[in-house]
């Protein structure tokens, strides 16, 4: 049973791809037609693949597997953080630091430092230091929070990574390939499905499109962990996001 309707996908503008001249021929099987120089994505396949992704991730979540959401572009950053937190998953929504997965031992030490500084800040210890020393520690804390806040409770590598915008997150995807971590990725018409485990052909630029797809995946994770999704927790795009 599909977890999304074609009407929902259409309303969110999921079908709008990039300009035809910017396409990746490997996306040909997922393109329905070309209209006014713009590729139109086949939403039947989008619905099928999104359903497949959600079924897989729901089962994985039920089995205790951990998911990392990744989306650092402006349109995706807020959505990624919000939806990951809603389903108690990890996220990266600022710059991807090279080696976040392949050099996890080093990154883990920085995560530990973040937690240490947060504890010192909460206890008031930083406030008791001389102003210059306190300022240095606060700058360090702000920097660590910016890049690592979404993974500060991550104690091991994720089991699945959900990616918004393959072209932007190439480094992260290569790290997943190297480590054998499965990926689910929103793929626009300028991307390659060959390096992704489950591609979801869709508009990766429109806020409503990103919100719909990432939200459905978060719903599946929530369902896998806790049972039926609490509809009151699901947020919808505000008028300013449309």
Curated annotation (Swiss-Prot):
Positions of disulphide bridges? none
Q: Which GO terms describe its molecular function?
A: structural constituent of ribosome
Q: Does the keyword Methyltransferase apply?
A: no
CDD domains the UniProt entry points to: RPS2 (cd01425)
Mark the transmembrane ranges.
Answer: none
Q: Which GO terms describe its cellular component?
A: chloroplast; small ribosomal subunit
Keywords, comma-separated and alphabetical: Chloroplast, Plastid, Ribonucleoprotein, Ribosomal protein
* BP GO terms, sorted: translation
Q: Which domain of life is it from?
A: Eukaryota
Tell me the NCBIfam families matching this sequence. rpsB_bact
Q: What is this protein called?
A: Small ribosomal subunit protein uS2c
**Which species does the entry assign this protein to?**
Pyropia yezoensis
């Amino acid at each position: 049973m599909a977890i999304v309707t074609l009407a929902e996908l259409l309303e969110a503008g999921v079908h709008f791809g990039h300009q035809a001249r910017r396409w990746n021929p490997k996306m040909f099987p997922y393109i329905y037609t070309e209209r006014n120089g713009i590729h139109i994505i086949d939403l039947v396949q989008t619905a099928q693949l999104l359903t497949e992704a959600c079924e897989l991730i729901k089962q994985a979540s039920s089995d205790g597997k951990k998911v990392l959401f990744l989306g650092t572009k402006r349109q995706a950053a807020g959505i990624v953080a919000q939806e990951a937190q809603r389903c108690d998953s990890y996220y990266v929504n600022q710059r991807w630091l090279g080696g976040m997965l392949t050099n996890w031992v080093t990154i883990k030490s920085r995560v530990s430092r973040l937690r240490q500084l947060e504890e010192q800040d909460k206890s008031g210890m930083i406030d008791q230091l001389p102003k210059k020393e306190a300022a240095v520690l606060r700058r360090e804390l702000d920097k660590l929070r910016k890049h690592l806040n979404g993974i500060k409770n991550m104690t091991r590598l994720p089991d699945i990574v959900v990616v918004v915008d393959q072209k932007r997150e190439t480094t992260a995807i290569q790290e997943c390939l190297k480590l054998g971590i499965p990926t689910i990725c929103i793929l626009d018409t300028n991307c390659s499905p060959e390096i992704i485990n489950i591609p979801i052909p869709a508009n990766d630029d429109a806020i409503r499109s990103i919100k719909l797809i990432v939200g459905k995946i978060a719903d599946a994770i929530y369902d896998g962990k806790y049972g039926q999704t609490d509809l009151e927790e699901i947020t919808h795009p505000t008028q300013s996001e449309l």
